[in-house]
Amino acid sequence: MIDDQVIAAARGDIPCDLVLKNAQIVNVFSGEIQKGDVAVQGGKVAALDSRDAKITVDLEGRFLTPGLIDAHVHIESSMVSPYQYARTVILHGTTAVIADPHEIANVMGVDGVSYMIQAAEGAPVGIFYAVPSCVPATHLETAGASLETKDILPFLEHPKIVGLAEMMNFPGVIYRDPEVLAKMNAAKSHRKTVDGHAPGLSGADLQAYLAAGAASDHECTTPEEALEKLASGMRIMIRQGTGAKNLNDLLPIVTEQNSRRIMFCSDDRHPYDLLEKGHINIMVARSIRQGVDPVTAIRMASLNTAEYFGLRDRGGIAPGMRADLLVVPDLVDFHVQDVYSGGVKVVEDGCGLPSPMDPPPRPQTSSMNVDVDGLDFTIKAGSGKARIIKLIPDQVVTAAMTGDVLQKNGEALSDPGNDILKIAVVERHKGTGNIGLGFVNGFGLQKGALASSVAHDSHNIIVVGVDDADMKAAVKAVADMGGGLAAAAGGKALSVCPLPIAGLMSDQPMEQVRRQLDILMQTAKELGAKAEDPFMSLSFLALPVIPELKITDKGLVDVNLFNFVSLFE
């Protein structure tokens, strides 16, 4: 809606709410850095010029840039609610994000997506959503819900929904699965974007995927892959998350000719990284240090994303655009000093200012339908060698190994001396009683157990341990607190991190979650865990779409065969 007061302020007929003077304005439209003033009225930029104002702030030559935008993120990976997430990323200059609520949708379906939209209202960051396209991800596990075309149609009418989220089922696209194509057609008929997800896809299959309308990809890991997709018309989101870090590898592809087709995203970023390292701002800073033109780097983090998703009033500093503005002392470190969101200062000297809004209530739907007393992690002894999941450090892929396992009194047992531990996935959504059982190598636990209700993509409870009693204690702790992470030994929980929102997120500030995680990680290390973040490693072992051997509540999955295999050969 046109605000006539903004027009009046732009003409100088009335005083503006705010003028930021003596700025070096990063103009992402012209590619220049211009000395000047910015007048703000009613939350929008009124003029790139000096005006009478109720409040005047002298920036004394500091840089003024557009707010940064994350092109693709799963807020659930931050382990906090959308409101608490926004409190953290605004400190780093992120004023808008495009979030895919895929994780909570796998647990709560339509209600989960609705919660995420509602929980973002009033946050200092503009949180927009792409409706999940692949819920559940596969038939090889029990999800809490499913989203069909009829379920996503109402969301496509919502003003906060800007597209269809990453279409992970690229085989379904290229082999013309009717339901997959129906979802894409629904998005296109509503003039929404269709985000892609096509790791390694090339040649004729890539062309077929693009012919269906997939428009972007955040899964590129090599320059060759990204350049082929750019040349074929795709937009590329360069990703720098907690697990997947592609910035250094992909920055060399950025040129003056192709930079308008490139954006920045985080995908999955955990509390420690968000609090201690930063967000999209660190991608901008590193890009500039590695030789990307500063205005180009900032444009990739703002205007490119806004234009792709149709956010016409965001991404730049110009009359009529939303006054999402960053004050930055220099463009090398790109340390964000002050942040204005809709013309209101929300960050001053790097610190968040108090917000009058109370966080929204968390959803009341239970997602812990587990008969803890009936849990049985017994594995009967087998006659052949066992198939064992082998962890690969710092990777979400695993290897498949075979070997002898410890057997006694007709049972197959954990063998911590050889780093072979029991692993189980307990179905938590529908009370089926399903328990998938197997063995894993590489965790290093010498005693105790670790359990988590964060287990991609269906987020059942996954547990690894040395003995059954501790595995049961860890699962009980997770179930009793409505979801979360737990470390147990001696038949009791030693430390926990509650995640009561769908078993994925906390309703507490990120700083508190980070403290709980620090204690939990220390406990895991004391039990012998070798990985830097054993819970992150654990969370991907139930994902049956990433090779090579994984486990779900239905059993052991050979991902290359895309089918179940027996535990013993």
Curated annotation (Swiss-Prot):
GO BP field: adenine catabolic process
Enzyme class name: hydrolase
Keywords, alphabetical: Hydrolase, Manganese
Listed cofactors: Mn(2+)
Origin superkingdom: Bacteria
GO molecular function per UniProt: adenine deaminase activity
Reactions catalysed, as given in the entry: adenine + H2O + H(+) = hypoxanthine + NH4(+)
InterPro entries according to UniProt: Adenine_deam, Adenine_deam_C, Amidohydro-rel, Metal-dep_hydrolase_composite, Metal_Hydrolase
One Pfam family per UniProt: Adenine_deam_C
Gene3D superfamilies according to UniProt: Metal-dependent hydrolases, Urease, subunit C, domain 1
SS bond list: none
EC number: 3.5.4.2
PANTHER family, alphabetized: ADENINE DEAMINASE, N-ACETYLGLUCOSAMINE-6-PHOSPHATE DEACETYLASE
Family stated for the protein in its record: Belongs to the metallo-dependent hydrolases superfamily. Adenine deaminase family.
Protein name: Adenine deaminase
Organism: Desulfatibacillum aliphaticivorans
Gene that encodes the chain: ade
